[in-house]
């Protein structure tokens, strides 16, 4: 019973809640999101809302589509390869190095933000995405601040670390750990 779409959605929803300044972002977990988004034997819903954060799905046909979505969604997106089938939390894109970054909930890859080249899917094969539709107009997180004042003025996202699970079929036990700096 793989729940990679659910784990990835919970990660992206938490990031959105933090960017929006929601004090209760810690309530957004794989288990809590699953209570409204997961259908046993079917998978994740196309559209769902938990604790003020709404996710919806769409289809993509290219890596360029993913770049555009990441520009519009600083919290990141869920990228799904229906042929694999597997999903990752696609967090950002570095144009200078032409590198995408993600958090992959699979046991072999369960780490904090890593290059997509370390994920078990290829972005060229991603055909479905989920992204946050509410709250909207989120500001991009500060990855590194030049001054203390810059850091205080900008929202920031803590590093996301995922605890390994025992198998790809048992992803429902993935835990999300966040550390605030």
Regions found by a protein language model. Give the residues of each.
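Residue-level detector of buried hydrophobic side-chain packing
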Residues: 4, 90, 178-180
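Sequence contexts marking disulfide-bonded cysteines in secreted/extracellular proteins
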Residues: 3-5, 108-109
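RTX-like calcium-binding, glycine/aspartate-rich low-complexity repeat tracts
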Residues: 145-181
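Conserved active-site-adjacent core of cysteine acyl-enzyme catalytic domains
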Residues: 10-151
């Amino acid at each position: 019973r793989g729940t990679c779409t659910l784990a990835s959605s919970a990660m992206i929803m938490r990031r959105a809640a933090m960017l929006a300044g929601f004090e209760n972002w810690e309530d957004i977990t794989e288990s809590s999101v699953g209570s409204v988004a997961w259908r046993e034997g079917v998978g994740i819903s196309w559209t769902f809302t938990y604790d003020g954060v709404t996710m919806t799905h769409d289809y993509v046909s290219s890596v360029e589509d993913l770049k555009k979505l990441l520009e519009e969604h600083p919290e990141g997106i869920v990228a799904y390869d229906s042929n694999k089938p597997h999903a990752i939390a696609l967090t950002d894109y570095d144009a200078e190095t032409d590198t995408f970054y993600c958090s992959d909930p699979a046991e072999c890859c369960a780490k904090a933000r890593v290059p997509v080249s370390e994920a078990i899917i290829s972005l060229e094969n991603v055909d479905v995405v989920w992204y946050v539709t509410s709250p909207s107009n989120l500001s991009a997180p500060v990855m590194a601040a030049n001054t203390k004042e810059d850091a205080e003025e900008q929202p920031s996202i803590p590093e996301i670390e995922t605890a390994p699970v025992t198998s790809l079929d048992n992803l429902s036990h993935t835990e999300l750990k966040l550390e605030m700096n």
